[in-house]
UniProtKB/Swiss-Prot annotation:
Protein name: Ribonuclease Z
Job description of the protein: Zinc phosphodiesterase, which displays some tRNA 3'-processing endonuclease activity. Probably involved in tRNA maturation, by removing a 3'-trailer from precursor tRNA.
UniProt keyword Zinc-finger, yes or no: no
Catalysis: reaction(s): Endonucleolytic cleavage of RNA, removing extra 3' nucleotides from tRNA precursor, generating 3' termini of tRNAs. A 3'-hydroxy group is left at the tRNA terminus and a 5'-phosphoryl group is left at the trailer molecule
Entry cofactors: Zn(2+)
Note accompanying the cofactor annotation: Binds 2 Zn(2+) ions.
Keywords from the UniProt entry: Endonuclease, Hydrolase, Metal-binding, Nuclease, tRNA processing, Zinc
Entry GO MF terms: 3'-tRNA processing endoribonuclease activity; zinc ion binding
Highest taxon of the lineage: Archaea
Enzyme active site: 65
Assembly behavior: Homodimer.
Cleaved signal peptide residues: none
Length: 311
């Protein structure tokens, strides 16, 4: 099961309704952070997410609303006597900015921090991978893909019977080794299982103007979290951002299953923004609020709000 927890959904500056960008992915007990705007530690505390379970942080770019919460997060980890290393990934200049951050006050973390300055790469971590891709924001900036590894197909009872196999350690051996010798025959895993099942794919753009690489990397994604700062092109001015209509068009071309419109400018109310999205979007979409959670189960998304759960 995968959970996407929206800790901050607004753009540029926080207000009473929403914090600046931070997204937590919870997968098999691990928490992966994508962007850490100011106040992320408080948002995590409200969401009952432990910073000690965060091993990797992926920063899309170094505008303040996407990374200024990093210092408080690291200091909290230090106060809680963290020992595990922390890995921070980001675009060009990541090492310089993190080093400046750590040298800006009178504290030193008592755990190792590994900084990874990356371009377009494919990083493998056990049962999932993280892909990075370049986006267009006027400064070095990356989007990220979380891709769960594909899973084997389900064991087919009729095929197991055909080969004289039954539930038990022998199936575990077959799954681990890929093939076994049984009753004088070589049996491969694919001989007794159905089609492989696609792992879940989640794409987060960070800040960007519309670009072809987003469509390419978002192809057939289960969830595309695309910035849609503005409602109208004339509101955008010269900034490198995307409108709601443009984000919906990219999602349609990429054939994503669900679009999450993200990074709403503080000038728009939720109702105003939702009305425009309903007018322009002909793909399934949501407009997450702070503390909304999207849970991927049995091939579909379910959304709830953590604060409402606890009332």
């Amino acid at each position: 099961m995968l959970e996407v927890i929206f800790l901050g959904t607004g753009g540029i500056m926080p207000n009473r309704e929403r914090n600046v960008p931070a997204i937590a992915l919870r997968y098999k007990g691990e928490i992966i952070l994508f962007d850490v705007g100011e106040g992320t530690m408080r948002q995590m505390s409200t969401a009952k997410l432990s910073p000690m379970k965060v091993e990797k942080i992926f920063i899309t770019h170094f505008h303040g609303d996407h990374y200024l919460g990093l210092a408080a997060l690291i200091q909290t980890m230090n106060l809680w006597n963290r020992e595990k290393p922390l890995h921070i990934y980001g675009p060009k200049y990541t090492f310089r900015f993190i080093q400046n951050f750590l040298n800006s006050g009178f504290f030193r973390p008592g755990f190792d921090i590994h900084v990874h300055e990356i371009g377009e790469v494919r990083l493998k971590f056990g049962d999932y991978e993280i892909w990075s891709f370049k986006v267009e924001h006027g400064i070095p900036a990356l989007g990220y893909v979380f891709k769960e590894k594909d899973k084997r197909g389900k064991f087919l009872p009729e095929k197991l019977a055909e080969y004289g196999l039954s539930e038990g350690p022998i199936l575990g051996k077959l799954e681990k080794q890929g093939q076994i010798e049984w009753n004088g025959r070589i049996i491969r895993l694919e001989d007794v299982t159905g089609p492989r099942r696609k792992g879940v794919k989640v794409v987060y753009t960070g800040d960007t103007e519309p670009c072809e690489r987003t469509r390419l990397f978002a192809e057939n994604a289960d969830l595309l979290i695309h910035e849609a700062t503005y409602l109208r092109p004339e509101d955008r001015g010269d900034s490198y951002h995307t409108t709601v209509g443009e984000a919906c068009e990219i999602a349609k071309k990429a054939k994503v299953k669900l679009l999450a419109l993200f990074h709403r400018a503080f000038r728009y109310t939720y109702d105003e923004y939702m009305a425009k999205a309903r007018e322009l979007c002909d793909v399934p979409f949501v407009i997450p609020k702070d503390f909304d959670v999207l849970t991927f189960k049995s091939g579909r998304w379910e959304m709830r709000n953590l604060l409402e759960d606890w009332q």
